[in-house]
Amino acid sequence: MIINFLFKDHAAHIEIGGDFQEFLSDIMNLLPSFLDKDGYRQVTTFSHVSEKLMENIDKIVEKYKKRVIEVYKIRSLFKQYNQGEPFFIIPGAISKEELENLNSYLVTVNDPDPEESRKKLEELKSQISRSYRFIQQSGLVRVSIGEADKSKRVCRYCHKSTPEVTFKQIAHTISEALGNKTIITNTECDECNNRYGTGIEMDCANYHNFIRRFYNIRGKTPLKDGGTNFKIEHTTDGNIKIGITLTDAEISEFERDKKITGKLCFPLHVNQKFRPVNVYKALCKYVLGILDDDDMAPFQSTIDWMDGNLQISPLPKVAVLFPTNFHLNNPRISILIRTSEQEELPYSIGIVEFTDIAYCFIVPIQDDIVNYSDEELWNRIAKALPIYKPQIGWRLKDFSSDIQQDEIRSNLNFVQRSKQEDK
């Protein structure tokens, strides 16, 4: 028996062995109910997280803790969310289309006018489809992309097959270090998985070191508790403590900026080695990982560039949005492939989102018909791609440098909110 617990940023499909109809009944009784016209009690599948709900889940844990070990997973799942978070509980199998429709509902249900929000969401999808084919993996469910039979696999990157290469490892499409546990690329051989994992993907993980520490995202290797001048502690009650050591010069600058702007801004230093261009290459590798095997041919020059066998110059800038107005527990990967004859648009665009940072970037190919250095290029992209709107905070960043950086410097800004914002 499978019970689906659906949130807007996560879908958990928990399988319960044996015949546990009583357990299922108790789980469904967590949800609101009503009497139909014939007087029969009907249970809805939708509700919101609340104190009462958590109390009832604790009772279910106490009742079934010796019989249904999965009950602890259910409680841990709900503890991740704040009160008021919408969710569905649906028993049995659920299709990808149903999952997407329910997710659209969850994303918009708390909006002032959810119907209008869902309408706008569909309009955005329609606008994108006029220029691009849109492919996305949201990380809500575990997916394996590419040939399932290991004996028939051909690596999408090096084009080698067995017995020349092996496919024994689990190749995560986007690094575990960025929170991915669910999106897998079958057709990435062990040799390429290791090479990318210790190369461009390692640089990308290093570049996002502070975000990984702040959100306690653990990959294969343990995280340190801080940087050169700060330490981060995740307390047992769910809070985050940050201790920062400032030099005399930094203290003077902090006090001066505080008087002028009224904001609290602390410099953070992390000793991490990375090459900016490798961050860009890793982002491209992530989005290529969600394509079907048959869609890879146009991106051979991209792979050659990722592997250092081809120079693509100039490289376009990358659009970065941080923070976003949402938080993702699972990374979300999207790639758009041009279907129209609009020569003013790039052939392919990638979008990578995790925690509360988003990247929108051109997937570079050698024979693209657009000029990557054209200053108007991103303005044209904004018209075709409503996801990218400079006015909501996207900024363009240059990741073209192949010079190794030994330190990451960033700022931690605190903005005082009004009492009305806290209500």
Predicted segments with their positions:
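Polybasic, low-complexity binding patches
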Residues: 196-238
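Short flanking/linker segments adjacent to small metal-binding domains or redox-active Cys/His motifs
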Residues: 232-259
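Short Cys/His-rich Zn2+-coordinating modules
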Residues: 131-144, 168-176
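C-terminal, charged low-complexity interaction regions
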Residues: 10-11, 20-23, 28-73, 261-423
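Histidine-centered nuclease catalytic patch
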Residues: 161-185, 200-202
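Short cysteine-rich clusters marking metal-coordination/redox-active sites
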Residues: 155-158, 189-192
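Low-complexity, highly charged intrinsically disordered N-terminal segments
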Residues: 59-138
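Short, flexible, mixed-charge glycine/proline-rich loop motifs
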Residues: 138-152, 178-183
